[in-house]
């Protein structure tokens, strides 16, 4: 499983969602996802999808957001 994933690549919601779900399936409690330039795509939609894996937003800044798997 991955403990930390930094997303800094495609800026299309569909592409980011595909990557996030792929890594979420390979994560565990405590895994953190950091998304760069999250205002360029629909982060609300992605974060909502990740809640089914137990991810919650723990910090957000100007262009980065961090989610952590709580369960």
What label would you give each PLM region?
Residues 1-5:
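A short acidic, Gly/Pro-enriched loop at the edge of an enzyme's catalytic core
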Residues 8-11:
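Switch II (G3) loop of P-loop NTPases
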């Amino acid at each position: 499983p991955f403990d930390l994933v930094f997303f800094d690549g495609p800026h299309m919601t569909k592409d980011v969602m595909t990557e996030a779900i792929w890594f979420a399936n390979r994560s565990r409690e405590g895994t953190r996802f950091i998304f760069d330039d999250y205002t360029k795509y629909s982060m609300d939609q992605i974060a909502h999808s990740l809640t089914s894996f137990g991810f919650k937003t723990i910090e957000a800044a100007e262009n980065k957001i961090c989610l952590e798997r709580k369960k």
